[in-house]
Amino acid sequence: MFPNYDADNPTEEQAKIGWAGHGHSIVEVSKVGKTGELKREFGPLNRRITATTEFTLVGPAAGSDYVKTSADKTGKKVKGTLNNCSGGITPWNTMLSGEENFDQYFAHAKLDDKKAQESLERFGMEDGESQRKWERFDKRFDVSKEPNEPNRFGWIVEINPLDPKSTPVKHTALGRFKHEAGNIHIASDGTVVCYSGDDSRFCLLYTSPSPRD
């Protein structure tokens, strides 16, 4: 991506380009007659969702002490999404995507709190610098400075592509792990079910049925 890129010494500009390059593109297109081709339209729906876009955290973990940081005392506003994997379209025409392999972005993952340290290790985070060295330019990627920041990733995200002013959401009710996809299916009895796999080694496929209330 960058000529003569030095992985051990990226520049701040390169890091910021990396932040902008992560996430999702919402692109407005139109059909070209019956050719099967699509034409890009420069309409109001086009936008980027990146590693610096504000998300709203919802569900049981939202607002808990585990997701509060120095930049977000509420624990309900998350900056960005990372390493987005497969997803799907919901019956209400929004898009889901899983945050996968987010461990690679965080540095100095060694804490005195035993429970917190076990969580970091469970997700594969280690002491020392991160692969991308983003912690040099934004302290939220340094676990020794922001120990709860990793807890704000590893969720299913939901984006409304038809409302460019909408704030994307992270759903904590669907569990935190290395989400391989987040796909919706409506069962024969009308129950909405979300399917997602944990992309860690030797892990599981999860189903999350709605309570129908």
What residue spans do the PLM features occupy?
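Carboxylate/His-rich catalytic cores and anion/metal-binding grooves
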Residues: E12-T53, N84, G88-F141
